[in-house]
Every structure is written in C-alpha cells, then in structure tokens.
Amino acid sequence: MTDPNSKAPRLQGRQEDKQTQTPPPRPPPPPQPPLTPRPDSSPHQNSHNKPKPEEEGTDGGPPASQGDRKRSKGDQGPDTGPGLGPGRGPSPKPTPLGPPPGPGPRRSPRLGPLQADRDPEEGPQPPAEGEVEGHPGGDQGHPPPPPPAPHNGHSGHEPKVQQPEGPEGREGHEEGAVGGEGGDEEGHPPPPPPPTNGHEGGLLSSVASLLVKWEGHFDQLVQSIQDDLEDYWKKLATPQ
C-alpha cells in the first residue's frame, strides 16, 4: 500500500514549480500602415484661393483624389466628357472674384431736382397757353376778334313796321319817326378803333362800312316821313 503522505510533497512541489515559472513572452503586434491624409472636396483650391502644395503618399506618389477614384469606377466627373478619358487633366482654375458692388457714388441733394427735370421719361410736356395741337404758337400774335359791341337804341337794321293809312296812322308814324331820330342820336355807336392787324382790321372795316350804309338809308327814310307829314298838315289846313 502506498503512503498517502507521499502524495502531498509531490503536489506541493508542482505548485511551487508553477509559481516559479515565468509566462512565455507575447508576440509583438503587427505593424500598422501609416495614415493617409483625407482628400479635400476641392484639392486644387483652398479657402484663400491659393494653390495647395501636393502631399506625397506612403509610396512617394501624389495622393489619389476623390475625382480620380470616381473616374476609376467608371463615373464621369465634371472635367471629363464623353470623348475624354479618366487620365485627362482638370479644368483651369477659376479666377478670383472682384470686390462686391457697392451702393454707388453718392449724389448731391442739390442735383436731385435738376436731374429730375432733365429726365426724358417724364413724357411729353403739355402745350403752352395759346398753342393748338398741330399749330404750336401760331395764334399767339393773332387773338380771336372780339364780338361787336351792342348798339343802344335803334341801330338802323330793324325791320320796318307798316303803319295803317289814315290820319291816326300818319300821326303814329310821325311819333315813331321822331322817337326813332332821338334813339338814333342817343344810341349812335362810337367810331371803330384802329385795326391792330390785317385780319381784324378787315373785319372792322367791313362792319364800319355796313354801319355807314345803314345810317344813310335810315336818314333817307326819316326825311321821306317828314315830307309826308308836312303834306298831311297842309291838307288838313285847307278847307274842303
């Protein structure tokens, strides 16, 4: 039979061996590839409109841009047309924009009304006084003739009133003739004013000649009436 106490020293010796043993060294981690810079959306132009220097990649060549990657997959970029290959160069760089337009030169407040008067878009000006459409300023020197002045009393061109025959009719006719003479003397129109121009002078001269003619006819009529009255009184004075 084996002694149980003999196993105890063996187990104890194994535990001591495990504690004294060092763990094996760990293998070194695998080398990681170096990080490549992230390509910008506009690799040829930065925020200050300056060309960006090209950076070398891990293998010494220029970094692959996003546009080249798209072209390698078969997509057409903005710089490639239907007849251009993926290896063609990009489009030329855009020129920097100029300064934004300002509010413009200031205008003096004194020149405002003058420029408004000279604006040709206001439309045609209304014609001046005395101008007629189609004849501007033609009637300014020739105003229309004034209407003839009204004549007081008997002007001489009134229709003759026939008096009834007989002694009563002759007396009434005589009274009317006497009244007509007085009215003619009171209502005699003044002489016409001197003509100012050719047109108005011709009109006034014709009116004056007509008035003179009518006045002569009226005087003849009054004279004939007076002669008739004298004969009538003579007949009344003689006994029949």
Swiss-Prot record:
<keyword id="KW-0945">Host-virus interaction</keyword>
<keyword id="KW-1121">Modulation of host cell cycle by virus</keyword>
<feature type="compositionally biased region" description="Basic and acidic residues">
    <location>
        <begin position="167"/>
        <end position="176"/>
    </location>
</feature>
<feature type="compositionally biased region" description="Basic and acidic residues">
    <location>
        <begin position="67"/>
        <end position="76"/>
    </location>
</feature>
<feature type="compositionally biased region" description="Pro residues">
    <location>
        <begin position="89"/>
        <end position="106"/>
    </location>
</feature>
<comment type="function">
    <text>Contributes to multiple aspects of the viral life cycle including viral genome amplification, suppression of suprabasal cell differentiation and egress of newly formed virions. Induces host cell cycle arrest at the G2 phase by associating with and preventing the nuclear entry of host CDK1/cyclin B1 complexes. Inhibits cellular DNA replication by preventing loading of host replication licensing proteins MCM2 and MCM7 onto chromatin. Within the cytoplasm, associates with host kinase SRPK1, a splicing factor regulator, and inhibits its activity.</text>
</comment>
<comment type="subunit">
    <text>Assembles into oligomeric complexes. Interacts with host CDK1. Interacts with host SRPK1; this interaction may favor expression of late viral transcripts. Interacts with host cytokeratin components KRT8 and KRT18.</text>
</comment>
<protein>
    <recommendedName>
        <fullName>Protein E4</fullName>
    </recommendedName>
</protein>
<keyword id="KW-1035">Host cytoplasm</keyword>
<keyword id="KW-0244">Early protein</keyword>
<dbReference type="GO" id="GO:0030430">
    <property type="term" value="C:host cell cytoplasm"/>
</dbReference>
<comment type="similarity">
    <text>Belongs to the papillomaviridae E4 protein family.</text>
</comment>
<feature type="region of interest" description="Disordered">
    <location>
        <begin position="1"/>
        <end position="204"/>
    </location>
</feature>
<keyword id="KW-1079">Host G2/M cell cycle arrest by virus</keyword>
<keyword id="KW-1048">Host nucleus</keyword>
<feature type="compositionally biased region" description="Pro residues">
    <location>
        <begin position="22"/>
        <end position="37"/>
    </location>
</feature>
<dbReference type="GO" id="GO:0042025">
    <property type="term" value="C:host cell nucleus"/>
</dbReference>
<dbReference type="GO" id="GO:0039592">
    <property type="term" value="P:symbiont-mediated arrest of host cell cycle during G2/M transition"/>
</dbReference>
<keyword id="KW-0597">Phosphoprotein</keyword>
